Regions:
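Asp-based phosphoryl-transfer active-site loop
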Residues: 6-19
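Acidic, His- and aromatic-enriched active-site or binding-groove loops in soluble protein domains
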Residues: 124-149
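Conserved small/polar residues in nucleotide/adenosyl-binding loops
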Residues: 162-164
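Residue-level recognition of oxygen-bearing side chains
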Residues: 22
Length: 164
């Protein structure tokens, strides 16, 4: 049926998910059968754990998932990162300086143990406000409005830009 030395990776949005942002019962059944028979399957997405986890509940994923465009490798069963590849503090500071020069307000993500801390200075443009409103109650993501985005050396830095 399939090659047992091949890893299959699917995106979520626009690929695995329906237009309603769900994994269909048919897709879940087919994938779970293939996974039970030895298929190496996982997903890669720009989403964070708090956004991806509810969408993947129907799947019996045995492999870690790739989150935040490859920044985080995450174990869905243990609900914890396996690997994090943060931005170096100097690079994060340089990126924030560029955003500030161009009057762009990004979300600045820091990983504090298993919690994603999302700092921001304002909820403009409208896309930033919508992003915040749709995710502000996520269990493993905490939003904090700050006067100034500051990079610290004690927590991995992850930048995300929601700006349309």
């Amino acid at each position: 049926m399939h090659n047992l030395d091949t890893l299959y990776i699917s995106d979520l949005d626009g690929t695995l998910l329906t237009p309603e942002c769900k994994v269909s019962d048919e897709t879940a059944s087919a994938l779970n059968t293939m996974i039970a028979n030895g298929l190496f399957f996982t997903v890669a997405t720009a989403r964070s754990a708090s956004s991806a986890a509810p969408l993947l509940e129907k799947l019996n994923l045995r492999l870690p998932v790739i989150l935040m465009n490859g920044v985080v490798i995450y174990d869905m069963e243990k609900r914890e990162p396996v690997s994090v590849c943060p931005i170096e503090p100097e690079a994060a500071r340089a990126a924030l300086a560029i955003f500030e020069r161009h009057h762009i307000a990004p979300f600045y993500n820091r990983l504090n143990q298993n919690t994603l801390e999302v700092c921001f200075t304002q909820l403009k443009p409208e896309a930033n406000r919508k992003y915040y409103e749709s995710r502000k109650n996520a269990p493993d993501k905490h939003f904090t409005m700050v006067n100034h985005l500051t990079v610290t050396n004690d927590m991995p830095s992850l930048l995300s830009l929601i700006h349309i």
